[in-house]
């Protein structure tokens, strides 16, 4: 019988696209730290020893954008001049202008409308303690472990990718781990056999163990399968903000509306509505009302209330999807202003999301399960 596999990937914070995300979110945080009402849509491009920062920013904050970018690059670990991209020598150009007055008119405090149209998804399931799908949770844990190793091993470099294939049975239950792929940039002085042993024993084995799996049970493990990975980071590939939207969410396990997160202030529903959708889905699962849930929201630009809200429990709900939807409508203010208030989003909290992930991280406000007891009690009264 053919295996039922699902695969998700992740990247480290030194991947070129994630470098761009980190710079954009660092600039967002710098603006919000001084002016919580900053309107920010910051896009970044990085390539060989060059960084372009552009976009629309309306703020009373005084921010040295190049300095913020250099610090973000330095924090990631690009500090070696010979690698073709480093914090001290990278050329940085800025092309920033203010937000369109037409957009601002429909999203100001009096109107509180959405900053754009679009649909956003949030999901949760019982496959992991953090209520995330196992393939993306493992991929994320592996990439975060790689990042830790980069900062403790001078022979490793920040650019890396991970990928995990999980086997499921016909009922959708996890059977085991079929394949793990890890690629990490490194110094030319790191012998390949030593690197592979280091990654197998110091990265893959402990992460699998944390999730209850033995590395010996994995059918296929590929570590730097093409061999040397010395040329990497922005010197190897150009990076752009918002190009890792599947990595940033659920690894393809749940749907995606297409909007990116990084560099956007919370009036942009691409970000804030995706966060509240995750919050609602996670709380439904935490309340025991379903074992797997996807929530969809959709908005029209300048309109405060969502044009649609839909819950899909994949047949696992203890009450109907329509009743689950009704519970959410009664308990959560889904206007942009309401989302911002509930999750307290006008704060400089975004740079860590570009580094360690948006979902499945316990201290994120949208990861809290404070709504679960309320939903559980209300469900008993329906």
Language model features with spans:
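Conserved phosphate/anionic-ligand binding catalytic regions in large, soluble enzymes, centered on
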Residues: 9-11, 15-20, 113-127, 230-254, ...
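Short, charge-patterned binding micro-sites
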Residues: 41-59, 301-305
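A short glycine-rich, hydrophobically flanked beta-strand micro-motif that places a catalytic Asp/Glu
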Residues: 38-42, 160-166, 219-223, 289-300
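N-terminal, positively charged regions that mediate nucleic acid binding
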Residues: 1-41, 374
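Alpha-helical support elements that line or immediately flank enzyme active sites
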Residues: 13-32, 127-144, 264-288
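Glycine-rich anion/phosphate-binding loop at the beta-strand->alpha-helix junction
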Residues: 191-284
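Internal helix-turn-beta structural module
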Residues: 47, 292, 299-382
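Glycine-rich, mobile lid/loop segments that gate access to catalytic sites or pores
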Residues: 7, 67, 74-231, 360-375
């Amino acid at each position: 019988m053919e295996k039922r596999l699902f695969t998700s990937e992740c990247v480290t914070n030194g991947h070129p696209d994630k470098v761009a995300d980190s710079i954009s979110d660092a600039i967002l945080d710098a603006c919000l730290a001084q002016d919580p009402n900053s309107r920010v849509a910051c896009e970044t491009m990085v390539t060989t020893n060059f960084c372009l920062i552009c976009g629309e920013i309306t703020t009373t904050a005084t921010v040295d954008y190049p300095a913020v970018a250099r610090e973000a690059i330095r924090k990631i670990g690009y500090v070696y001049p010979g690698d073709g991209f480093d914090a001290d020598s990278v050329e940085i150009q800025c092309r920033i202008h203010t937000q369109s007055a037409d957009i601002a008119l429909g999203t100001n405090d009096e109107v509180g409308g959405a900053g754009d149209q679009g649909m956003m998804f949030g999901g949760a399931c019982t496959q992991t303690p953090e209520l995330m799908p196992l393939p993306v949770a493992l991929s994320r844990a592996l990439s975060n472990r790689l990042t830790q190793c980069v900062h403790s091993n001078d022979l490793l470099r920040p650019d890396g990718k991970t990928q995990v294939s999980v086997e499921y049975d016909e009922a959708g239950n996890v059977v085991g781990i079929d394949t793990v792929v890890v690629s990490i940039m490194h110094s030319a002085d790191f012998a390949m056999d030593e690197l592979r042993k280091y990654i197998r024993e110091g990265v893959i084995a402990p992460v699998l163990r944390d999730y209850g799996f033995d590395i010996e049970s994995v059918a296929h493990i590929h570590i730097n399968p093409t061999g040397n990975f010395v040329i990497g980071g922005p010197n190897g590939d150009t990076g752009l903000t918002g190009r890792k939207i599947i990595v940033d969410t659920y690894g393809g396990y749940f749907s995606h509306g297409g909007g990116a997160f990084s560099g956007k202030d919370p009036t942009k529903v691409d970000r804030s509505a995706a966060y509240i959708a995750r919050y609602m889905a996670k709380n439904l699962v935490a309340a025991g009302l379903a074992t797997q849930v996807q929530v969809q929201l959709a908005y029209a630009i300048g309109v405060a209330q969502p044009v649609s809200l839909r819950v899909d429990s994949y047949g696992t709900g203890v009450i109907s999807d329509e009743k689950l939807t009704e519970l959410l409508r009664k308990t959560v203010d889904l206007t942009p202003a309401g989302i911002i208030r509930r999750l307290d989003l006008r704060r400089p909290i975004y740079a860590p999301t570009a580094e360690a992930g948006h979902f499945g991280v316990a201290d994120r406000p949208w990861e809290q399960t404070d709504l679960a007891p309320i939903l559980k009690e209300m469900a008993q009264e329906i």
